[in-house]
C-alpha cells in the first residue's frame, strides 16, 4: 500500500532537485519561446492522477480492456469540448503529440511514394511537413511552397505547383510564420487538384479557439494540433476532421500508430479545453496578440528587422544581421540574461541551421504570467539592450537584474 505522505523529495532527491531547479528557472526567466507556455495547476493536477494507471486501448464505449467506464467519461468530455471550441464534426484526442497526429493523417490517406505539398522548413514550415530527414520527407515525394519577395506565403506559386504536381495531400500551417494564413485559398486549390486538405494549426490553436485568428476547420478535411503552445494545455495532440474521415483517422491512431492512450493526459486535455471555453481565455489571447505587436514594434524601433515586416499572431522572426550576431549566440547571451528564446533560420538564411541569422520570439508564456503592453515593451527593450552589447558582461548583469525584478513582480504560480 502506498503512503500519500511520502513525496518525491524523500524517495528521489535527485529528481526532486532537478524539478525544483526547473521551477526556479521558469519563475525567474522570461519565457519567449513561441511553442512554450505554462499549464494551469488544474491541468497539471489532472496529469498526476490515478488515471495514469489505466490501460484503455480503443475508444469510449469500445475498449479492449475492462474497467474503462470512468476514463470513458474523461475522454468523451475532451472530445465534446474540443469539438465545441473549434466547431468540428469529429475529434480524436489520443495523439501523444503533434507529430503523431500528423503521422496519423499520412497513414489514413497516403501510401509511400505519394506526393504531398507543405511549407518549406527553411521558410517557416514544420519538419513534419516534408523535411528531408523526417519520415514525411523519407516516405513521400515532397513539393514545397514558400514565401514571395514580401516574405508572405506565395499563394500563386503554391497554386501553380499544386496544378503541376497533383499532390495527394496539401498541408497548410507553419512553425515560424507570423501572418494570417488564407485557409480558404488553400482549400480551393486542394479541391481543384483533388487533394486532401490538411491544416496543422499547432501554433495558432489558442488564437483560433478565441476567435481572433482564422479558423481552418470549415475549410479543411482534417486539422491537427498540439494541445500545449498557445492552447495552454498539457503536452499532446489532437485531430479534428470532417465526419466522413472519422473512421479512417481513428483507425490510423489505434491500432495504426498507438496502443494504449495516456488517459491522465487526456483528462488534462479536457481540463484545458474547459479553460479555453471560458470568456477570460479570449481576453488572454487578445493580450497575446497585443503583446506580440508591442514587442515587434519596439524591436523595430531599436534597429531590428521583423521577417514579413510585422506579426499578425503570437510569433515573430527577428533578423539579427544588423547587430552582427548569430541566432546561436543570441540564444546563449539572452539566456544568460534570463530571457529564453530559440535560434531560428530566416528566409534565405546564409548561416547553417544550427547557427542561423535569426531568433523566434513568442508571447503566449509572458502573457500567461500577466505581462501586458508595458511589460511587453520593457521586455523588448531588454532584448535589444542585450543585442546592442552582447559581449559586455556588465551589460548582461544589468539586464539580468532588471529581468529578475520584473519576473518577481509577476510570478507564474505564485
UniProtKB/Swiss-Prot annotation:
Role description: Catalyzes the reversible interconversion of serine and glycine with tetrahydrofolate (THF) serving as the one-carbon carrier. This reaction serves as the major source of one-carbon groups required for the biosynthesis of purines, thymidylate, methionine, and other important biomolecules. Also exhibits THF-independent aldolase activity toward beta-hydroxyamino acids, producing glycine and aldehydes, via a retro-aldol mechanism.
UniProt organism field: Albidiferax ferrireducens (strain ATCC BAA-621 / DSM 15236 / T118) (Rhodoferax ferrireducens)
Broad class of the protein's primary localization: cytoplasm
Family designation: Belongs to the SHMT family.
EC assignment: 2.1.2.1
Gene name in the database record: glyA
Keywords for this protein: Amino-acid biosynthesis, Cytoplasm, One-carbon metabolism, Pyridoxal phosphate, Transferase
Superkingdom to which the source organism belongs: Bacteria
Annotated metabolic or biological route of this protein: One-carbon metabolism; tetrahydrofolate interconversion; Amino-acid biosynthesis; glycine biosynthesis; glycine from L-serine: step 1/1
Any single GO BP term: glycine biosynthetic process from serine
Cofactor: pyridoxal 5'-phosphate
Compartment(s) where it occurs, according to its Swiss-Prot or TrEMBL record: Cytoplasm
Matching InterPro entries: PyrdxlP-dep_Trfase, PyrdxlP-dep_Trfase_major, PyrdxlP-dep_Trfase_small, Ser_HO-MeTrfase, Ser_HO-MeTrfase-like, Ser_HO-MeTrfase_PLP_BS, SHMT-like_dom
Positions bound to (6S)-5,6,7,8-tetrahydrofolate: 121, 125-127
Pfam families hit by this protein: SHMT (PF00464)
Phylogenetic lineage: Bacteria, Pseudomonadati, Pseudomonadota, Betaproteobacteria, Burkholderiales
Coiled-coil parts of chain: none
Annotated site residues (Plays an important role in substrate specificity) in this chain: 228
Cellular component per GO, a single term: cytosol
Catalytic reactions of this protein: (6R)-5,10-methylene-5,6,7,8-tetrahydrofolate + glycine + H2O = (6S)-5,6,7,8-tetrahydrofolate + L-serine
Alphabetized HAMAP family for the sequence: SHMT
Transferase recorded as keyword: yes
Entry's Gene Ontology molecular function annotations: glycine hydroxymethyltransferase activity; pyridoxal phosphate binding
Record bears the keyword Lipoprotein: no
Subunit structure, as described in the record: Homodimer.
Top class in the EC scheme: transferase
Name of the protein this chain belongs to: Serine hydroxymethyltransferase
Amino acid at each position: 500500500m502506498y503512503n500519500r505522505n511520502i513525496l518525491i523529495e524523500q524517495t528521489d532527491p535527485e529528481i526532486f532537485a532537478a524539478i525544483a531547479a526547473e521551477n526556479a528557472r521558469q519563475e525567474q526567466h522570461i519565457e519567449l519561446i513561441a511553442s512554450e507556455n505554462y499549464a494551469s495547476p488544474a491541468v497539471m493536477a489532472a496529469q498526476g492522477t490515478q488515471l495514469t494507471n489505466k490501460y484503455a486501448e480503443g475508444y469510449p464505449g469500445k475498449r479492449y480492456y475492462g474497467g474503462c467506464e470512468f476514463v470513458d467519461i474523461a475522454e468523451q468530455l475532451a472530445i465534446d469540448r474540443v469539438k465545441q471550441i473549434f466547431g468540428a464534426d469529429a475529434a480524436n484526442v489520443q495523439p501523444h503529440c503533434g507529430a503523431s497526429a500528423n503521422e496519423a493523417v499520412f497513414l489514413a490517406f497516403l501510401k509511400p511514394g505519394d506526393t504531398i505539398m507543405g511549407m518549406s522548413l527553411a521558410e517557416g514550415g514544420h519538419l513534419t511537413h516534408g523535411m528531408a530527414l523526417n519520415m514525411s520527407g523519407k516516405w513521400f515525394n515532397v513539393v514545397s511552397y514558400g514565401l514571395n519577395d514580401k516574405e508572405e506565403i506565395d499563394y500563386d506559386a503554391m497554386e501553380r505547383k499544386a496544378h503541376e504536381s497533383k499532390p495527394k495531400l496539401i498541408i497548410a500551417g507553419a512553425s515560424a510564420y507570423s501572418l494570417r494564413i488564407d485557409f480558404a485559398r488553400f482549400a480551393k486549390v486542394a479541391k481543384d487538384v483533388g487533394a486532401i486538405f490538411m491544416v496543422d494549426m499547432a501554433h495558432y490553436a489558442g488564437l483560433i479557439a478565441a476567435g481572433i485568428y482564422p479558423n481552418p476547420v470549415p475549410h479543411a478535411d482534417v486539422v491537427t494540433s498540439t494541445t500545449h503552445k498557445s492552447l495552454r494545455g498539457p503536452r499532446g495532440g489532437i485531430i479534428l476532421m470532417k465526419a466522413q474521415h472519422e473512421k479512417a483517422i481513428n483507425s490510423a491512431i489505434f491500432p495504426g500508430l498507438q496502443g494504449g492512450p495516456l488517459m491522465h493526459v487526456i483528462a488534462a486535455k479536457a481540463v484545458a479545453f474547459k479553460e479555453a471555453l471560458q470568456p477570460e481565455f479570449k481576453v488572454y489571447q487578445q493580450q497575446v496578440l497585443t503583446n506580440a505587436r508591442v514587442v515587434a514594434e519596439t524591436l523595430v524601433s531599436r534597429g531590428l528587422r521583423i521577417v514579413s515586416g510585422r506579426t499578425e499572431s503570437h510569433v515573430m522572426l527577428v533578423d539579427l544581421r544588423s547587430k552582427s550576431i548569430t541566432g546561436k549566440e543570441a540564444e546563449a547571451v539572452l539566456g544568460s540574461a534570463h530571457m529564453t528564446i530559440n535560434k531560428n533560420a530566416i528566409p534565405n538564411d546564409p548561416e547553417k541551421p544550427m547557427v542561423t541569422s535569426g531568433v523566434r520570439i513568442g508571447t503566449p508564456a509572458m502573457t500567461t504570467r500577466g505581462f501586458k503592453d508595458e511589460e511587453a515593451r520593457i521586455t523588448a527593450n531588454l532584448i535589444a539592450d542585450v543585442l546592442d552589447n552582447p559581449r559586455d558582461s556588465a551589460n548582461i548583469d544589468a539586464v539580468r537584474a532588471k529581468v529578475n525584478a520584473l519576473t518577481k513582480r509577476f510570478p507564474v504560480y505564485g
